[in-house]
Design a protein with these regions (language model features):
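Acidic, polar-rich low-complexity tracts and alpha-helical solenoid repeat scaffolds
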Residues: 1-58
């Protein structure tokens, strides 16, 4: 199902942002999280999680 696929793709971007942050590449981590926030339009836990991670990077 397409919605499930979109969810897991977005979830993978959150994990990718975590990996960037752990490697010290905060610019790429922030860019990845902002992209998720700007482009993911479902009402579930993805955008709040992205916002929380972004706040921790600032």
């Amino acid at each position: 199902n397409r919605e499930a696929q979109e969810y897991w793709v977005a979830k993978s971007f959150l994990l990718l942002a975590d990996a960037y942050a752990r490697k010290g590449n905060t610019f790429q981590a922030k860019s990845t999280l902002k992209s998720v926030i700007d482009n993911y339009d479902k009402n579930d836990d993805i955008v709040p999680a992205a916002k929380e991670r972004l706040q921790k990077l600032k």
